[in-house]
Amino acid sequence: MTSIVFMGTPQFSVPILEALVANDYQILAVVTQPDRKVGRKQVLQQTPVKEAAVRLDLPVFQPEKLSGSPELADVIALQPDLIVTAAYGQFLPTKLLEAAKIAAINVHGSLLPKYRGGAPIQYAVLNGDSEIGITIMHMAKKMDAGDMIEQASIPIEATDDTGSLFDKLSYVGRDLLLKTLPGIIAQTAPRTPQDEVQVTFAYNITKEQEQLDINQPAEQLLNQIRALRPQPGAWLAVNGQRTKIWQATVAETTTDQAAGVVVALNKKDFELAAGNGTVLKITEIQPAGKAKMPVQSYLNGVGKQLAVGQQVVVQDAE
């Protein structure tokens, strides 16, 4: 039986771990991020991978920082045949990668060499890509730079956002890993070096990237909204108030109004002029300090003071 140390953190990783157990791979340990306090009540929450590991009765390690930790030595001492990572969230020390008797493998959420880094799915949506995929790859000291074993792709639908693609890709990754593992174990699987000329990066989303720039075309704004959903959410400064935009469409109409001006307003419509004469039609919104709401509820409450022709969006508000 092939022994594995599995490393992962979010829900994306859970179907992969469950499949390894179901297919009789020996999971020596699961390494995941520490429990974190979340929400206003600061409730201590386990990672989805820890919850799955506990349910599957697997040993769990949760170092705050893996490098130099006592847990690192414990994991290395397990001498696994394979290390399998899927969205773990920390760099792996070289001596850990070298501890795998056969290979250290990563399930990466992009079609490498495109989108190395921690936010490949977000960037694929942000950039309006037509497809996304999974790469099964060997791990290397350099971030996401190892040789590729196999890839699988799926289309990005207009209705997709980062959340839906995370869900879809977790199963694509699961199936592709199960398909490639026999060849990896037999050491007959292909190894294709990445073309460094084609490399792009998808670093973690910054706070600055959460703000929508109303001077951008509506299609780009919509991509940003989808890329930042379900969290952390994209926002506009509406009358100086940070207002999250959760659902929107690109209106069929165009306008000669300046970006940030209200161009349509009634019980069901809240349309803003965006860049290049385009119009963003907002359908779900979250004013500061409030819950998400349909735009109808917003216009009956907080948004009552808005008027057609009014410049309501100001950049760089806090």
Curated annotation (Swiss-Prot):
Under the heading InterPro entries, the entry gives:
Fmt, Formyl_trans_C, Formyl_trans_C_sf, Formyl_transf_N, Formyl_transf_N_sf, Formyl_transferase-like_C_sf, Met-tRNA-FMT_C, Met-tRNA-FMT_N
Q: What is its EC number?
A: 2.1.2.9
Alphabetical GO CC annotations of the entry are: cytosol
Top-rank EC class of the record's enzyme = transferase
Q: Give the Pfam families listed for this entry.
A: Formyl_trans_C, Formyl_trans_N
Q: Where does (6S)-5,6,7,8-tetrahydrofolate bind?
A: 110-113
Going by the UniProt record, its keywords in alphabetical order are: Protein biosynthesis, Transferase
Q: What Gene Ontology molecular function terms does this protein carry?
A: methionyl-tRNA formyltransferase activity
Reaction catalysis annotation: L-methionyl-tRNA(fMet) + (6R)-10-formyltetrahydrofolate = N-formyl-L-methionyl-tRNA(fMet) + (6S)-5,6,7,8-tetrahydrofolate + H(+)
Keyword Transferase present in the record's keywords: the answer is: yes
The record's comment on protein family reads:
Belongs to the Fmt family.
Q: Which NCBIfam families match?
A: fmt (TIGR00460)
Q: What does this protein do?
A: Attaches a formyl group to the free amino group of methionyl-tRNA(fMet). The formyl group appears to play a dual role in the initiator identity of N-formylmethionyl-tRNA by promoting its recognition by IF2 and preventing the misappropriation of this tRNA by the elongation apparatus.
HAMAP family for this protein:
Formyl_trans
This chain's protein is named Methionyl-tRNA formyltransferase
- Organism equals Latilactobacillus sakei subsp. sakei (strain 23K) (Lactobacillus sakei subsp. sakei)
Give me the gene this protein comes from: fmt
